[in-house]
């Protein structure tokens, strides 16, 4: 597992606390905007990052937990990760739908 990259600040206009979860120089982004990005228990944020050289799935403990790479190998479709209510992670790679049970990692 990698260290936390978390930082936060308060928005001066609204007073809301803003969390920045990644600080790596590579591109990192959320899942597709219609899909949940948090695990069912709201403790982990799932995101896509290119920090491993291609689009891969990562998770970060929220708000200040470590970052862990979930997928490896051939690049995933960058906006495909989806989390089911039971915590199973679905994604697209090479035109096929794949699943990962994070509990078995």
For the regions a protein language model found, what residue spans apply to each?
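Blade/loop signatures of beta-propeller domains
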Residues: 1-19
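N-terminal low-complexity or amphipathic/hydrophobic leaders
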Residues: 33-42
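Beta-rich carbohydrate-recognition and catalytic domains
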Residues: 4, 95, 100-105
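Predominantly a core beta-strand signature of beta-propeller blades
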Residues: 6, 17-18, 65-69, 104-105
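Hydrophobic/aromatic beta-strand positions that recur at structurally equivalent sites within the blades
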Residues: 10, 60, 100-103
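Surface-exposed loop and turn segments in beta-propeller and other repeat-based domains
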Residues: 19-28
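Residue position within the beta-strands of beta-propeller blades
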Residues: 44-48, 90-92
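Blade-loop segments of beta-propeller domains
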Residues: 27, 32-34, 54-97
